Amino acid sequence: TRYIALCDYLKSEYGISVKDVIPEEKKPFSKIYQKNKKELLLSDYSSLETKKLHAAAQIAQEGSDKEIEEYLTKFKFPSDESKKLTKVALLNYCGAAILMPYKLFHSECKKLKYDLELLQNTFATSFEQVAHRVTCLQDPKLPGIPFHFLRVDMAGNISKRFSLSGIEIPRYGGACPRWNVYSALTRPGVIQAAVSKMSNGEKYVGIARTVEKGIGRFGQSKSILSIGLGCEAKYAKEFIYSENLNINDKSTEIPIGV
């Protein structure tokens, strides 16, 4: 599998051994890199897709750490912690690029009209990873649709947000309860598509679907999150989920606020 190939690459190129381990109950973790032992510990409670991303991100760190550190010197950070989090985000971006190479991924997105489940199957990644990756297709020479992306928990709190579509996503707390990213929580695993209209008149096509984090195991329940992805209505013909929607039917528009 690709996971085995990534682990083999880490071992052959950088001498890093990947070990799948069961974390102690009071010390949960998803990933730990023990630099002195050159061991990457990955939790057996993480999904295979998450493990692949961690392994790919470690490859990115080993191969591009100097370049990333130089890039970070261009910015001022309010704290060391914020700089550390930014570096983690960059490494995860690079890891996703290893799993879903830009040109190939862009080509498949165009061919499949951003069908996230087909893309998920093609690249053997998770629904959330694919949804996040489509927001990164912003090379001026080979651009994709400018999407917005958000992730919410069962309590309605936004834990991830990103917007290139122009829609405003609250920085703190939750968003408008009429967004389908919330109604999706009532129908787990089902993709919901809708046309939304903001108070300023802008229209968006958006989809939402729940995802499960981690893997099921005895005595523990998986956490449920909802992923929302959308774009301006003018891109509807390029977005497969708009095919059963009447973009011009005002009666089906869902008025939403921030």
Report each predicted region and the residues it spans.
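Conserved binding/catalytic microenvironments
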Residues: 2-258
